[in-house]
Amino acid sequence: GFGKVAMPPHNLTLTVAGAGMLWVGWFGFNAGSAVAADNSAAMAMLVTHLSASAGALAWMAMEWIRHGKPSVLGIVTGMVAGLGTITPASGSVGPAAAVVIGLTAGVVCYFATNWIKNKLKIDDSLDVFPVHGVGGILGTLLAGVFCSTQLGVFSGNGFSDGIDSIGG
């Protein structure tokens, strides 16, 4: 039954190889959204890399704190959390914000994964919802907080845009 036996992937080498391909492919996903090989595409590529790295680092730190050692699978999962969380913001944030978003993604998605598995007893074998779903929601919210000065909640016209988005 659920929760009695941990079921990690059978071949972590292939998991890491697949994660590497996913990471490289995500550059095309985020930088390709700029539809031109210009500075915005380069920035999207940079922030994608930084967020994925920070997500992996944060997840690794959480495992180290809670279990005494990190796992390869955890580092890969943190990387995917960083990638998913930066996607909504990749065209509108700078490098420092990308690191904060990635670190936040690693920590929040780590706790979301544990909560969904252990408290809700939902068997999500690839942790799809806590990593991609929670990460995407978090990224959407953080995009509004950290995006450029023309668009951001704190520096742009965020309040009136928020009112407009809810039908006001």
Tell what function each PLM region has:
Residues 1-168:
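Glycine- and aromatic-enriched membrane alpha-helices
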